[in-house]
Amino acid sequence: MPCAGVLDSQSDRMVIDPDAWSVERRVVARDLLDAGDARGAYAVLVRDEPASDTDKVESHMLAGFIALRAMGDGKTAHRHFSTVLSEATIPGTTSRALYWQGRSLEALGDLRSARVAYEKAARHVTSYYGQVARARIGLQELPIRSLPNPTATDRATFGARLSVRAIDLLYRADQKELALPLVGALAGDLKSPGEVVLLGALTQRYKDPRATLVVGKAGLNNGFAVDALAYPTGGIPRFQPVPGSIETPVVHAIARQESAFNPKAVSHANARGLLQLLPTTAAKTARNAGVSFDAKRLTSDAAFNAQLGAAHLGELARAYNDSYPMVFAAYNAGSSRVTQWIQRYGDPRRPDTDPVDWVERIPFAETRNYVQRVMENTQIYRTRLNGRTALMIDRDMGQRSGDRTAGR
């Protein structure tokens, strides 16, 4: 691979955009890994010198993964994951680094330290790697934290904010689109968990799940226990599932990631509505389900969109024997891509393929992130919607399981 040699010799200090160069390094490293050249892939990454924290994290995570899972070098891998942990500022990155620290320590035979790393990761209950870590050490529950109680000071400070008054006036005027950016700006600035709860309550009062989600995400990123706000349950209207539809928590999980609960969303690829369905896919699903189809309803009728999305996801679940990483990857990137990845990386439904590894090997960053986000969303929504705290991510990740159709 000629470009690999260039990347191996080029110092990023000499290039105009080291972050763009870093992205190219990771692409080439993955190509080399797919070709069986793990050491060449690692060599490309160790010379990486990105400027942004995000690219530093991604570069070290991939280098550590290659060192651990392809080269069997737990010590080197642990060093990379420790670097990521020192740079981590949000729960998702922290739990990711801690989980892989645990895996590298396991490989080194230090089981006690590995468990400590997993236990630390497991505290981040809303993150994919926090949930995977919980399952790895046998924690079978996924507790959703109660919202903090706002203090009298929180209420006084919040009520005196001009931005709060402006948001309330916009809601009263039925101007949710104008209120949303103001909500987002305020949510990012709030330093008190009590005020975050009050802002979330304001958005809920006006039945605006999009804004509630924005508030909840900002709160989680600031380390506040606002799980219920970050996973709103009012974004999907009641709908009649057709036989064989996927479980309702997955519908919420997908909509949260696909459209952030915007029923009128239309992507550059013409995917439409809450679950971002392509009209051709939706029409085929409707035909299979015996439902009359009208493409305009994908953005005008949220319940119709949810019904067809649930039915299509049910079709994918049957095709992949309930392997949710495969289902979600196919929903995002297409079934033909999943077929390619099975050929390259193995079948995550089989015991000889680690489904966590399989997800990490997905070559598209967007799809890799998508699968992990929808997986974590699903675990939380099972608790939010069904009142169940049992963690089922191990079952979801790979091996065949029981019925998970709507209503179960």
Regions found by a protein language model. Give the residues of each.
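Helix-turn-helix repeat elements of alpha-solenoid scaffolds
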Residues: 1-7, 31-43, 68-82, 137-144, ...
